[in-house]
Amino acid sequence: SASVWMHIAYTGPRILNIDEEGYPTQPYGFRSNPNSIIDVADIVFVNPVNTGYSRMVADKEGKMPEKKLFFGINADIKYLAEWVNTFVSRHNRWESPKYIIGESYGGTRVMGLSNELQNSQWMYLNGVILVSPADYNLYSTGQPIYSAINLPYFTAAAWYHKALPSVLQNKDLLEILPEAEEYAINTLMPALAKGGFISDEERNEVAEKMSYYSGLSKKVILQHNLEVPTSFFWKDLLRDKTGQTIGRLDSRYLGLDKMEAGTRPDYSPELTSWLHSFTPAINHYIKTELNFSTDIKYNMFGNVNPWDRRNNNTRDGLREAMATNPYLKVLNQSGYYDGATTYFAAKYSLSQVDPSGKMKDRFTFKGYRSGHMMYLRNEDLIKANDDLRSFIKESSANGKSAKY
């Protein structure tokens, strides 16, 4: 997708008109963002090919470039690294501390970009910022790992919708998440790894505990062989309460399906809500604030298929970049109610970047009581920008030598 989300809702000097929780309001438009990090950093928003106004163009002979030059994990990283080099050189910013930030798939992108910049462009960074990162290495791992690390998200979303047992519901969210995390790693993951070798007794014990932490019934958990898809969770959590579905990217949002029956929601209520307000805001902003007019459509999402997912070494790339650059630090920002790139999946991914734990003091994790775009909730817009500001200040070298 385009960089529109962070451009006019998070770090930029203008933000779109939404209410305190992030829902659309009319009239559409934008206003000043008093929380922008423009006071500590110059911000460059980049729209990859086929997003925003970025397009492939023909060469002098009228021949279009091949899609494989842009549409793939490694191709994407390679051309964007070249772009960053060109931009930095044109604007004479080689001496400046540099940070790259990526949201969702952008998390995969900047993990790989950190190493590509160092290895191919000889450009060393001070920080990598992951906002609700999507780690595709994790999604392609064995199902027991992915299923287990989703449980704490189930707990968070169920707590928000008051669907947990009272012993949990009466506690604060941050009191109950650590025990859900501990159960997911130390009990649920080993149990799921057993597959058909698990005993009936253990299967029932696990199903009961999963029900306790998720708000789902023990019956449906057993029907799924203990591995409940997130899509089913979004459909089922409130099925017998209000008949509504909950959002994928932000489970605070509610949807209305044609039928209460089924295994997955008809649509993503949070995404329709966001497009409702973001699309008019960015088009209005570009024309009236930036004074740029064109008949080219601003692509909120672009067609980048077929996307080459082969040879995804971005996680190892980030580790290598950190190992070879003592300055480099990482900040992760995740929303507890994000059901697509869950907060605990992000924690787990960071643990796999540095399994030795030797660089753990260079990782910072920040969680927020919102979803994928935590900055849409005004309280978290303030907090998340303050966290960015602190990270930038703390990771600037300030005369310190880059050495171990």
Tell where the protein language model's regions lie, with residue ranges.
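N-terminal cap/lid subdomain of alpha/beta-hydrolase-fold enzymes
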Residues: 1-69, 351
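A catalytic-pocket lid/entrance helix-loop region that shapes and gates access to the active site
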Residues: 12-19, 114, 118-211
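Alpha/beta-hydrolase fold catalytic core
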Residues: 194-341
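Alpha/beta-hydrolase fold nucleophile elbow
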Residues: 93-105
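Glycine-rich nucleophile elbow surrounding the catalytic serine of serine-hydrolase chemistry
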Residues: 102-115
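Catalytic histidine-centered segment of alpha/beta-hydrolase-like enzymes
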Residues: 369-381
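Short alpha-helix in the alpha/beta-hydrolase fold that links the catalytic acid
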Residues: 328, 342-352
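Alpha/beta-hydrolase active-site loop
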Residues: 38, 48, 68-89
